[in-house]
């Protein structure tokens, strides 16, 4: 969603808006591939690929901005509504397979469905409140940044805590990482050619977000490589993957 009315954009931005739209389309392709890959990987490995709370936060964001505060352009509507439909599949496989990962915590294992419902409701309320506070155009941007950081932290922690690579793959990591990374050049174009409407993209908060995102998601690839190597060198660790 554009944070400002595109009809008010300066001529300089309109000349390069196709580049920003291309970045948005590539983002949609990357995340679509990631969602499809997560569904397939979850069914194959009988687990969930995305950490639970980030998954609920992401699903709540899709609900909020695909239905309640729908995007304005046809491209954005298609990208995010298709993302919501695929995310339903991701949620289904997570709910189905999550109990297997929580045998060590019976209280959590017995109440996983309730946890999913409460988490989605809680995150959805946060997204809606933020949209009402600052407007849906700016709210979707800031809440998406929060979702991304939670996803990056959650994915890294899940990989390290599990100690195995079941539910993870280089394809899932790269499609997620690249699907989000490609929005950085989009934001640079918006800030460069339409600065008055995108001042926040030059703020310390935004620069911090991009930096932390690069560090966390870049670290995930390295950690996955290390875990895979550890599984190959230690038969006991390799059995945990099965």
Curated annotation (Swiss-Prot):
Keywords: Lyase, Membrane, Transmembrane, Transmembrane helix. It is found in: Membrane. The keyword DNA-binding does not apply. The keyword Acetylation does not apply. GO terms for biological process: terpenoid biosynthetic process. The chain crosses the membrane at residues 16-36, 51-71, 78-95, 114-134, 141-161, 169-189, 207-227. It is a multi-pass membrane protein. Pathway: Secondary metabolite biosynthesis; terpenoid biosynthesis. InterPro entries: PaxB-like (IPR039020). Its EC number is 4.2.3.-. GO terms for cellular component: membrane. It is an enzyme of class 4 (lyase). GO terms for molecular function: lyase activity. Diterpenoid pyrones display various biological activities and higginsianin A shows anti-HIV activity. Terpene cyclase; part of the gene cluster that mediates the biosynthesis of the diterpenoid pyrones higginsianins A and B. The first step of the pathway is the synthesis of the alpha-pyrone moiety by the polyketide synthase dpchA via condensation of one acetyl-CoA starter unit with 3 malonyl-CoA units and 2 methylations. The alpha-pyrone is then combined with geranylgeranyl pyrophosphate (GGPP) formed by the GGPP synthase dpchD through the action of the prenyltransferase dpchC to yield a linear alpha-pyrone diterpenoid. Belongs to the paxB family. This is Terpene cyclase dpchB. It comes from Colletotrichum higginsianum (strain IMI 349063).
């Amino acid at each position: 969603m554009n944070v400002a009315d595109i009809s008010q954009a300066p001529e300089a931005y309109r000349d390069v808006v196709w580049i920003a739209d291309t970045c948005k389309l590539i983002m949609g392709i990357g995340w679509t591939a990631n969602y499809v890959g997560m569904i397939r990987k979850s069914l194959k490995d009988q687990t969930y690929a995305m950490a639970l709370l980030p998954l609920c936060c992401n699903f709540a964001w899709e609900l909020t901005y695909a239905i309640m505060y729908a995007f304005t352009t046809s491209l954005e509507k298609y990208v995010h509504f298709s993302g919501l439909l695929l995310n339903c599949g991701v949620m289904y496989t997570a709910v189905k397979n999550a109990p297997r990962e929580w045998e060590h915590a019976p209280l959590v294992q017995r109440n996983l469905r309730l946890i999913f419902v409460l988490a989605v409701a809680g995150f959805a309320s946060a997204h809606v409140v933020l949209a009402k506070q600052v407007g849906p155009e700016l709210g979707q941007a800031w809440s998406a940044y929060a979702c991304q950081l939670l996803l990056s932290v959650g994915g890294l922690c899940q990989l390290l805590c599990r100690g195995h690579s079941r539910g993870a793959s280089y394809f899932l990591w790269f499609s997620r990482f690249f699907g989000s990374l490609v929005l950085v050049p989009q934001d640079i174009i918006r800030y460069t050619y339409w600065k008055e409407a995108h001042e926040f993209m030059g703020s310390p908060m935004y620069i911090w977000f991009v930096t932390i995102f690069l560090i966390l998601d870049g670290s995930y690839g390295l950690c996955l490589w290390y875990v895979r190597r550890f599984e190959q060198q230690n038969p006991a660790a390799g059995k945990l993957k099965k």
